[in-house]
Amino acid sequence: MNRLKSFSLVIVIFLFSSLVFAGGHSKGMYIHIINFNITGIDRSQYEAAAMKLTSVFAAVPGLKRKHWLANEENNTYGGVYIFDSKESHDAFTESELYAGVKGNPSFTNFSGKSFENIDSLAKHTRGTE
């Protein structure tokens, strides 16, 4: 068996045994990523309005970090929200704050996706705290 196949087999066995012996997946951090296009405002207006909300986001229970995203060339903006638990993530995505972001008339083509962090892998790449 060549080295790549051997390595792949070891990885598959490790992942399977981790799931079996750990009782499933990790219950650690949850991540929510949103994207949208802005309409009727430019980037500087968006940033000025967002600056007024930074303290509101900083006060969200369980929110460890929020990264603000911008790709001005493609008119795509958004955020990466990192939560300490699924519960805090769920509370945020069901909150009035999130509904306000999602329903903002200056944001079109809104999409939001949720992910759990794979802590068993992330701990090796500075993806956990």
Residue ranges and their predicted role:
Residues 1-9:
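Bacterial N-terminal signal peptides that target proteins for export
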Residues 80:
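Beta-strand acidic-aromatic groove motif in beta-rich domains, primarily in extracellular
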Residues 5, 15-77, 86-94, 110-129:
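Short S/T/G/P-rich N-terminal loop/turn motif that feeds into the first structured element of a domain
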Residues 97:
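Short, polar loop motifs at secondary-structure junctions
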Residues 100-108:
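C-terminal structural segments of small proteins and small subunits
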